[in-house]
Amino acid sequence: PLVVHLLDPLHAEETYERVLPMLNQKSILVVEGIGCSHHARQLWQKLRHDLRTGVTFDLHYCGLVFFDTARPKQHYVINF
């Protein structure tokens, strides 16, 4: 599987659009700082609702996006 790590919330959206053609059903996207700013929260919402994404996990400090669209679209918030 391909794992892509988006470190910079300010440039994450353009990086996501750039790597999107390389992602497949086995890909995982790690998004840092999903709650650190208004822009980061908006991007996280956009990724969660994108029809090309499947299961998402909100870990508070980062988010995980899986692209296996064969599974039902689902969002989880993990509190620990």
Placement of each model-derived feature along the sequence:
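A short acidic, Gly/Pro-enriched loop at the edge of an enzyme's catalytic core
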Residues: 1-4
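Active-site residues of response regulator receiver
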Residues: 6-8
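C-terminal substrate-binding/active-site "lid" region of AdoMet-derived donor-dependent transferases
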Residues: 11-80
